[in-house]
């Protein structure tokens, strides 16, 4: 209860700050841009839906969004036009569990090779640079269901950053360069999928010459990329 109360107070203070900003030229109130950052954290990332709901209820405009891992999915959905209520409905339907189960909907199995329900392993060779060392990476869950889900979720946006209603970016981790990678253009589904490539759970995404894993490895709370990329007044 205390945490909820403090969160509500923070929202009210943010709303007051955003609404009460003064224009230095004539003293009138001017709108201030707000950027919202959504961290990773597995199922805990779904709490971001409540934060978005609280901000909207208190009249706080959301001009930019950024996210990592599960936070990237919620941020991208908001950017694509999903309301917090619609997100809650999707979560309540239980489909999120299906996304991460690795099980393919029987309706779609004719289009994919049959994948058993037991954990299956694939290996990739990961070049770590000048050291020449390589190690074996495995994934426990098929990424097919989540990839199909992302394609459906962002179909209206054509899978394109430029067609989003709210500017969005997400962060992945380049394991070759050992650094975070900011993604704010190109294939939206690919970007979100790479941002949530949890090691040993989902296979990494290969984008150009990069092997991308979950963004939380190097930047679980990407406030700096949002600040540099969009320059909002408030984060």
What are these regions (language model features)?
Residues 2, 20-68, 76-235:
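Patatin-like phospholipase
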Residues 7-16:
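Bacterial N-terminal signal peptides
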């Amino acid at each position: 209860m205390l945490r909820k109360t403090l969160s509500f107070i923070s929202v009210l203070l943010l709303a007051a700050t955003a609404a009460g900003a003064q224009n230095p030229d004539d003293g009138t109130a001017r709108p201030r841009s707000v950027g919202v950052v959504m961290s990773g954290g597995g199922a805990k990332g779904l709490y971001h839906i409540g934060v978005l709901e609280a901000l909207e209820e208190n009249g706080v405009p959301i001009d930019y969004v950024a996210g990592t891992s599960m936070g990237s999915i919620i941020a991208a959905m908001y950017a694509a036009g999903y309301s917090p209520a619609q997100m809650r409905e999707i979560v309540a339907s239980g489909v999120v569990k299906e996304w991460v189960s690795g099980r393919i909907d029987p309706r779609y199995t004719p289009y994919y090779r049959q994948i058993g329900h037991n954990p299956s392993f694939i290996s990739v060779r990961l070049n770590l640079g000048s050291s020449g060392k390589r190690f074996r990476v495995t994934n426990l869950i098929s990424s097919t269901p989540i990839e199909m889900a992302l394609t459906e979720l962002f179909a209206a946006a054509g899978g394109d950053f430029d067609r989003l209603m709210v500017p969005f970016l997400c962060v992945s981790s380049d394991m070759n360069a050992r650094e975070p990678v900011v993604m704010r253009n190109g294939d939206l589904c690919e970007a979100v999928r790479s941002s949530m490539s949890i090691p040993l759970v989902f296979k990494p995404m290969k984008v150009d010459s990069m092997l991308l894993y979950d963004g939380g490895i190097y930047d679980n709370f990407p406030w700096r990329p949002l600040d540099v990329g969009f320059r909002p007044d408030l984060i």
